[in-house]
């Protein structure tokens, strides 16, 4: 019975729904304006009744923008029972109003539609802010023991240790075999010939100037220093023999005249012809001295007399005019080379381990032509002041050696060679010193540091030579 009532109720509901569908069907609306073909907004669903106020406002704006058309809008297929624009064409028969009164009521929400298709992924969003760092993790367990590493590089050499005490001197060794004779050294290269000095282009010798006028006699000066002996003059030619004059008449006795100046000593006259012997006459009265005769011609030069005292210095004469250029003289003879002072020596040690704190005697002379080095004292004596070069090459064996170069009574340079056992080494030095005449230079070793050695196979040599002498003028050598 109850099932029948349910079936009746279902049929009634279906009938009412069918009638409602028929009542909503209206004739096609007439359009006076062409509506723009727009896509229906998303979310807008077809409705069976008049659109709500929001939709009415939207449709009104769309209707104002549309143009008149003769074809119905494509939206009619969406809204099958309603017209979008204009709304004055919406009609409902009075007979159907009763059945359509449900349109006045609030629409009942329909069933939930199926979910739409998944949209395209949106653009990538901006990176978010850095998050707060998390707490530190728990300490993990200790890892397994690693493999053994490779061997490291060799370390640097350590500092030299403190030298030990010197050992006792060893026993005298046996003399070694005699060495072979060395080859003859090569001769030095011959020096180049010096260039000829430049001649003075404008240094012409002028002619001798004219003798100046004789100056007025000066005041009487004191006796000058004794002059140098003059050179002997050339022998003059002998003058012609004069004619024998006539004998004058005997004059009367004149008045006694004043004493005349002493005349120069004349040369001895020629011997006259032997006259005839006269008769012995009576002695006549003494006649008066005659008038002084004229000075005779200068006779031949007499013998060179003693040098007289130096005369007074006359006034300086006027400088004569420059003479004409003289002819070029003959080329002079080749001059002698300037003598260069020399001083050098080179000597070797003849006995090993010389006494300490005294000059080492290098008795094996290699060169000492000037004799400035003394093998007896072991010292070099400076005889030429200047700059010298000194050097030594010492063989050291069996013990340390501390060698000092002494100059001007002061240890100028020191060197040390540390050696022990039977090892052999060399110590050398080269130095330049400025010495004065009388300075001495030598080598010496300190106590307990005497390892200076020499043998048939090893030498120890001391050498020195003059580099250049001291300047004696304003021009350097």
Swiss-Prot record:
Keyword Disulfide bond: yes
Gene Ontology BP terms: otolith mineralization; protein homooligomerization
Glycosylated residues, chain numbering: 178, 202, 310, 381
Transmembrane segments: none
Compartments it resides in: Secreted, Extracellular space, Extracellular matrix
Record-listed 5-hydroxylysine modification sites: 178, 310
Chain positions covered by the region annotation Disordered: 28-55, 111-337
GO molecular function: calcium ion binding; extracellular matrix structural constituent conferring tensile strength
Biased composition (Low complexity): 298-310
Compositional bias ranges of the Gly residues kind: 182-191
Family: Belongs to the OTOL1 family.
Record function comment: Collagen-like protein specifically expressed in the inner ear, which provides an organic scaffold for otoconia, a calcium carbonate structure in the saccule and utricle of the ear. Acts as a scaffold for biomineralization: sequesters calcium and forms interconnecting fibrils between otoconia that are incorporated into the calcium crystal structure. Together with OC90, modulates calcite crystal morphology and growth kinetics.
Official protein name in the record: Otolin-1
Native organism: Homo sapiens (Human)
């Amino acid at each position: 019975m109850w099932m029948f009532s349910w079936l009746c109720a279902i049929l009634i509901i279906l009938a009412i729904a069918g009638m409602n569908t028929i009542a909503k069907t209206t004739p096609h609306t007439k359009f006076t304006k062409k509506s723009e073909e727009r896509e229906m907004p998303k979310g807008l669903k077809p409705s069976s009744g008049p659109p709500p106020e929001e939709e009415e406002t939207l449709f009104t704006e769309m209707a104002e923008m549309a143009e008149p058309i003769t074809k119905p809008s494509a939206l009619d297929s969406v809204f099958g029972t309603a017209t979008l624009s204009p709304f004055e064409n919406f009609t409902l028969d009075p007979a159907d109003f009763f059945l359509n009164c449900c349109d006045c009521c609030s629409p009942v929400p329909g069933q939930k539609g199926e979910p739409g298709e998944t949209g395209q992924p949106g653009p990538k969003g901006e990176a978010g802010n850095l998050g707060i760092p998390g707490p530190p993790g728990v300490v993990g367990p200790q890892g397994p023991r690693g493999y053994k590493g490779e061997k490291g590089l060799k370390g640097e050499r350590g500092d030299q240790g403190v030298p030990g005490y010197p050992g006792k001197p060893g026993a005298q060794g046996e003399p070694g075999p005699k060495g072979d004779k060395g080859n003859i050294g090569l001769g030095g290269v011959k020096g180049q010939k010096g260039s000829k000095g430049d001649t003075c282009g404008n240094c012409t010798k002028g002619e001798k100037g004219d003798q100046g006028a004789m100056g007025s006699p000066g005041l009487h000066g004191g006796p000058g220093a004794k002059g140098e002996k003059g050179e002997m003059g050339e022998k003059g030619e002998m003058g012609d023999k004069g004619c024998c004059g006539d004998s004058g008449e005997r004059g009367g006795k004149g008045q006694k005249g004043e004493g005349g100046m002493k005349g120069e000593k004349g040369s001895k006259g020629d011997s006259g012809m032997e006259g005839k012997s006269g008769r012995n006459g009576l002695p006549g009265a003494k006649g008066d001295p005659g008038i002084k005769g004229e000075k005779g011609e200068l006779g031949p030069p007499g013998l060179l007399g003693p040098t007289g005292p130096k005369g007074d210095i006359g006034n300086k004469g006027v400088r004569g005019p420059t003479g004409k250029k003289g002819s070029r003289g003959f080329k002079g003879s080749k001059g002698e080379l300037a003598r260069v002072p020399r001083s050098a020596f080179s000597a070797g040690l003849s006995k090993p381990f010389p006494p300490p704190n005294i000059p080492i005697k290098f008795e094996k002379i290699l060169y000492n032509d000037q004799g400035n080095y003394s093998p007896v004292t072991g010292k070099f004596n400076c005889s030429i002041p200047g700059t010298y070069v000194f050097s030594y090459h010492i063989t050291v064996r069996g013990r340390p050696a501390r060698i000092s170069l002494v100059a001007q009574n002061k240890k100028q340079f020191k060197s040390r060679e540390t050696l022990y056992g039977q090892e052999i080494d060399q110590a050398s030095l080269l130095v330049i010193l400025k010495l004065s005449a009388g300075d001495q230079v030598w080598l010496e070793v300190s106590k307990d540091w005497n390892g200076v050695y020499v043998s048939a196979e090893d030498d120890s040599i001391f050498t020195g030579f003059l580099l250049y002498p001291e300047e004696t003028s304003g021009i350097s050598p």
